[in-house]
Every structure is written in C-alpha cells, then in structure tokens.
C-alpha cells in the first residue's frame, strides 16, 4: 500500500481515536475540573469550570460532525492535503488529550488543543465543502 492510499484509513483511525478520547473526557471530566481549581474552591467555581469544559467538549463534538460529514460523504476523502492535515492534527490531539486526561492539565489548555487540532481541520473541511458545492469544483 502506497503512502498516499494509506492516508484514508489513517485519517479515519486518528479521527476516531480523537473522538473516543473526547468522549472519555466527557465521562470523567471531574478530575480535570478539579485540576483547574484552587485548593479551596467554592461549588460555584466548580460549576463554572465544569460548564466551561462541557462547552469546549460540545464544540469539539460539533467540529467532529463537520469533519465526519465531509469525510464520509466523500467530499474530502481523497483530498491529500486535507487528509494529511487531519491525520497530523488528530494524532497530535490524541496524544495531547491523553496527557490532558491522565496528568490533569488545566482546563484552559483544552481550548488551545481544540483550536489547533479540531477547529483548524474543520475550517479547512468547510472550505472544501464551499469549493465543491458552491463553486462546483472537483474535491481533489
């Protein structure tokens, strides 16, 4: 299998691995919320940070929907540039979020991980959607 033809399964696997880790963080977000708070915190501070993390994770799930829609519909499945960007971003996100989950990183770091590793590929996916459906160009 050549390097180009292996981008499609690699993209699917890294996208799915990133999705699984985001869902895992959703289920066990209490430890990460506690890592964001000072030692003496109020229930209101906990609730505020928990809501912030829920919003960030929900935005990430929305960005996954955009990427899966473009990928599974075939619009960007064979686009080499998008596949390479997506594989790199989601592999980086997978590793970063594993550290975020197990090391108890601060919640504000999640926004950085989301913006570079989820929002960037989703924005390029939207650009490909516009090029294909709006300007009637080939997806390759």
Curated annotation (Swiss-Prot):
**What is this entry's stated membrane topology?**
Multi-pass membrane protein
Q: Per the UniProt annotation, where are the glycans attached?
A: 79
Main subcellular location of this protein, as a coarse class: membrane
Transmembrane domains' residue ranges: 7-27, 53-73, 84-104, 113-133
Keywords carried by this UniProt record: Cilium biogenesis/degradation, Developmental protein, Glycoprotein, Membrane, Transmembrane, Transmembrane helix
A GO BP entry is:
non-motile cilium assembly
> InterPro entries from the xrefs?
TMEM107
| Location of the protein in the cell | Membrane
List the Pfam families hit by this protein, alphabetically.
TMEM107
> Cellular component per GO?
membrane; MKS complex
Q: Which domain of life is it from?
A: Eukaryota
Q: What does this protein do?
A: May play a role in cilia formation and embryonic patterning.
The record's annotation in PANTHER family points to: TRANSMEMBRANE PROTEIN 107
Which named protein is this?
Transmembrane protein 107
């Amino acid at each position: 299998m050549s390097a180009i033809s292996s981008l499609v399964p690699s993209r699917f696997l890294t996208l799915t691995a990133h999705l699984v880790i985001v869902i895992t963080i959703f289920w066990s977000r209490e430890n990460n919320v506690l890592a964001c708070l000072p030692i003496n915190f109020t229930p209101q501070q906990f609730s505020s940070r928990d809501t912030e993390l829920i919003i960030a994770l929900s935005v990430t799930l929305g960005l996954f929907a955009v990427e899966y829609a473009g990928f599974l519909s075939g619009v960007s499945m064979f686009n080499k540039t998008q596949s390479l960007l997506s594989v790199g971003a989601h592999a980086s996100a997978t590793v970063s979020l594993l550290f975020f989950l197990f090391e108890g990183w601060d919640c504000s770091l999640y926004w950085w991980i989301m913006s570079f590793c989820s929002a960037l590929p989703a924005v390029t996916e939207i650009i490909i959607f516009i090029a294909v459906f709006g300007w009637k160009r080939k997806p390759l």
